[in-house]
Amino acid sequence: MRVDSIGEGENAIIVLDKTPFYGEGGGQVGDTGVMESGSFSADVDNTTKNPSGTIYLHACTVKSGSINVGAEVSTAVDEERRADITRNHTAAHLLQSALREVLGNHVQQAGQLVSDDYFRFDFTHFEALTAKELIEVQNLVNKKILEAIPVTTQEMPIEEAKKLGAMALFGEKYGDVVRVVSAGDFSVEFCGGTHVKNTANLGLFRIRQEGSVAAGVRRIEALTGMGVLKYINGMSAVIMDVCSLLKIANPKAVVEGVQKAEQLIKEQQREINELNSKLAVAQIGQLFAGT
């Protein structure tokens, strides 16, 4: 339902004649931020686009004041969140190229979600990745980050892009002119999303999880930048808790400590089973003695 004005506490979709907000698309989530005009203030909770991609729809929650159709507003994108999303999107491109280099050119993108806290990448492959393959892929992406490769964007005719070997995004439809995002010659893809200026801006890359989502389709969840540090800190805290429980000073001895604890549990279970057997024999003896 179209309305001419909105006020405090109301939720609405606001359309602007121009916007700095990125509208959800290509697997990348939409931007958030704020919109203001005088006493009017609203949180932009999400940004999407109409089916043709020509109109940007800002899902807003009015925090104060009111506003009418035709009013001028100032906008501000949540830049920290956008930066996290941007790092993850470029990392998704590097990940696809790394997977193709490690596993083979049969790997094709089968979907993705790029958000601020992590990204997931679906791809065609016939079996689970081994621990060695996961480390190899992860190391290759981090190697490209350390190489500080400039990331460039260029619009060109689609046929020219195909000649360059640019990879297309799964499920996307393209016009005669496409936007190509390149990280040197390591990664060349059609893409309309946001990206860093240099692979070094990613900081770090870490695979969090790998699994199956369908027959012949695998999924990797991964992190970049501060997300990697938070993940490592969380894992370190768990390891230190385990060390404390096992009374181990050196974290490198955790595996040995767990193995010893497992062996102790097995021995105690064997002793319990022996005691139960002896108890059962004694009870049977008492039963017969009473007859």
Regions found by a protein language model. Name each.
Residues 1-75, 80:
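Conserved nucleotide-binding/hydrolysis modules and their immediate coupling elements
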Residues 22-35, 68-123:
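Active/ligand-binding-proximal structured segments within catalytic/core domains
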Residues 34-35, 76, 94-102, 136-147, ...:
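Generic, well-ordered alpha-helical scaffold segments in large soluble proteins
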